[in-house]
Amino acid sequence: MPRGHIRGLSQFYADGLERMEISIDKHNAAPLPYQHNLRIPITLHVGTQQYEAGLRSTPNMPVVWVSPDLRDNHGNKVSLARVLTNNGFRKNQRVYLEVNGRVVTVLPF
């Protein structure tokens, strides 16, 4: 099961919440369906909800990351930071990522 790290991006939304992403070291990212220079769509489960999300990677970066912008079941934009904080996760926290094809579940470390 890959391990991720919730990173703050030092950019803030209008309400003051810092943008966040989940980064995964490429050495542990093999089960994730990522490709360099492409945004690969995934279903991200956090708590009891699921979201449309994207995995990104570039050849020069040592990590794969879950992009900070999501869509909920109704197609509305929602931030990964808001979803994570509403479910008790915080910046700099380590997490497990349970991977089942293109479905990724965020679990506490």
Task: Give the label of every model feature segment.
Residues M1-F109:
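Acidic, low-complexity intrinsically disordered regions
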